[in-house]
């Protein structure tokens, strides 16, 4: 959720500083939205890589002889790595539809609350925290990680489509989504 808040703060920066008209005159709002998305996704990838490398020695030491680098990498990439783009796409789409920080924050918080409470028991709907209770060192984790990956990729495609739809609704010259 930190990256969702970071996305909303970055999107609201030009209107909060009252330089939105100047930025829109210098760079097309469509180009700015795409560049913002790429920058945030790049930051998320860098954060994931640094987190993965930072926790690697501690995890290998704590788990001991049963440590498997493949399971470690897959677990981080699926469980944490795909959550970052989901938050960025959701917050970016909410911002592009509403163009208001407070409404976008409420939308993201509502979907996060649904994922953590009501949708918790449905593995396909809990986008924020997948239904993975434990990973095994005796049996294969492939089925658990595969179902979590399917769930994450389904949400990733859905939120990418929602972001693309919101990209088409970027307001230019204050005319609104239909202008």
Task: Please tell me what each predicted stretch does.
Residues 27, 72-73, 86, 111-114, ...:
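Catalytic cores of nucleotide-enabled group-transfer and carboxylate-activating enzymes in metabolic
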Residues 4-24, 29:
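Transmembrane helix boundary and interhelical loop/hinge segments in multi-pass membrane proteins
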Residues 14, 93-97, 173:
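Helix-to-coil boundary motifs at intracellular loop junctions of multi-pass secondary transporters
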Residues 27-28, 37, 99, 110:
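An acidic- and aromatic-residue-enriched active-site/binding cleft used to recognize and process polar
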Residues 101-179:
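Terminal transmembrane helical anchor/hairpin motif
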Residues 17, 21, 49-51, 108-112, ...:
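Bimodal feature
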Residues 1-9, 33-102, 135-139, 154:
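Secretory targeting signals
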């Amino acid at each position: 959720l930190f990256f969702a808040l970071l996305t909303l703060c970055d999107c609201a920066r030009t209107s909060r500083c009252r330089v939105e008209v100047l930025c829109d005159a210098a760079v097309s709002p469509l180009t700015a939205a795409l560049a913002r998305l790429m920058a945030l996704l790049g930051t998320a990838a860098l954060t994931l890589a640094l987190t993965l490398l930072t926790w690697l020695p501690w995890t290998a030491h704590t788990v001991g002889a049963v440590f498997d680098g493949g399971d470690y990498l897959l677990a981080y990439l699926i469980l944490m790595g795909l959550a970052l783009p989901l938050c960025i796409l959701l917050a970016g789409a909410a911002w592009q539809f509403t163009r208001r920080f407070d409404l976008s924050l409420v939308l993201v918080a509502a979907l996060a609350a649904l994922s953590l409470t009501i949708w918790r028991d449905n593995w396909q709907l809990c986008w924020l925290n997948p239904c993975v209770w434990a990973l095994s060192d005796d049996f294969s984790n492939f089925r658990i990680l595969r179902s979590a990956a399917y769930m994450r990729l389904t949400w990733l495609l859905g939120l990418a489509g929602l972001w693309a739809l919101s990209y088409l609704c970027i307001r230019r010259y204050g005319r609104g989504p239909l202008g």
